[in-house]
Design a protein with these regions (language model features):
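Conserved glycine-rich beta-strand-loop-beta hairpin in the small C-terminal domain of fold type I
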Residues: 185, 201-227
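Short hydrophobic/aromatic beta-strand micro-patches
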Residues: 105, 227-229
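Structured loops at beta-to-helix junctions and adjacent beta-edge loops in soluble globular domains
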Residues: 169, 203, 229-231
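Short, conserved charged micro-motifs
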Residues: 233-238
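Conserved small/polar residues in nucleotide/adenosyl-binding loops
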Residues: 239, 243-245
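Short gly/pro-enriched beta-turn/loop segments at secondary-structure junctions
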Residues: 161, 195, 219-223
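Conserved PLP-enzyme active-site core in the AAT-like
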Residues: 1-194, 201
Length: 245
């Protein structure tokens, strides 16, 4: 977002998501979408999805959510107002670090015509004999154009074998993530009570600033990614880390 996409003419306005008014302030006339994560990397911070969805839709732009850390087992963003959901399938969906891949899920709910900001979907496409994707594909216009043009032009597709491997991982996603959460909570609680640990960042803890959102959006747990700070800072951390290089 910060360094690669600007080379293709796409710029990003970054905001502090802890204050929802920042989203409202950042939206400009040429803003095409709001992009957030269900669980932030690396502190697993949580954003009020429904509130951000309302802001995006008021400005007639879609809400795109990266649900890589959340996974479909823990949260389904479309049920909370997301229009498009993306995943890095390499992480929890695949589960074994064996393949590179990604997923795009189109809710089919966003009105691309009413938005007036997406001529690629509403105007004739000369590379497909003048087809208008909103007419040819209806609610699936967005994801259809991705498959018909962007996949064709960029080659951003995985091999059949890698797709097969990712599907094998998908079959056990719920079982694996359930265990991930169970194990993570044990470690989080252990570290949170450790005398040499200054702070643990995980929304399951009652003192985490997003704990209320955790209870609202993540009844099955908020993933297994967390960070912690040790007393003594960097010097103490390096003392323990360097012997294990």
């Amino acid at each position: 977002l910060a360094h690669t996409l600007p080379n293709y003419g796409v710029t990003t306005t970054f905001v502090d998501p802890s204050d929802l008014s920042n989203f409202e302030k950042a939206i400009q006339e040429n803003t095409k979408a709001v992009f957030i994560e269900t669980l932030g990397n690396p502190n697993s911070n949580i954003i009020d999805i429904e509130a951000v969805s309302e802001i995006a839709h008021r400005h007639k732009i879609p809400l795109i959510i990266d649900n890589t850390f959340g996974t479909p087992y823990l949260i389904r963003p479309i049920e909370h107002g997301a229009d498009i959901v993306v995943h890095s399938a390499t992480k929890f969906i695949g589960g074994h670090g064996s393949s590179l891949g990604g997923v795009i899920v189109d809710s089919g709910k966003f009105d691309w015509v009413a938005s007036g900001k997406f001529p690629q979907l509403t105007e004739p496409d000369p590379s497909y004999h003048g087809v208008r994707f909103v007419d040819a594909a209806g609610p699936a216009a967005y994801v259809t154009r991705i498959r018909a043009t962007l996949l064709r032009d960029t080659g951003a597709t995985i091999s059949p074998f890698n797709a097969f491997i990712l599907l094998q991982g998908l079959e056990t996603l719920s079982l694996r993530v359930e265990r991930h959460v169970e194990n993570a909570l044990k470690v989080v609680n252990f570290l949170n009570n450790h005398p040499k640990v200054k702070k643990v960042n995980h929304p399951s803890l009652s003192d985490h600033p997003d704990h209320a959102l955790y209870q609202r959006y993540f009844p099955n747990g908020a993933g297994s990614i967390f960070t912690f700070e040790v007393k003594g800072g960097q010097a103490v951390s390096y003392t323990h880390l360097r012997p294990h290089e």
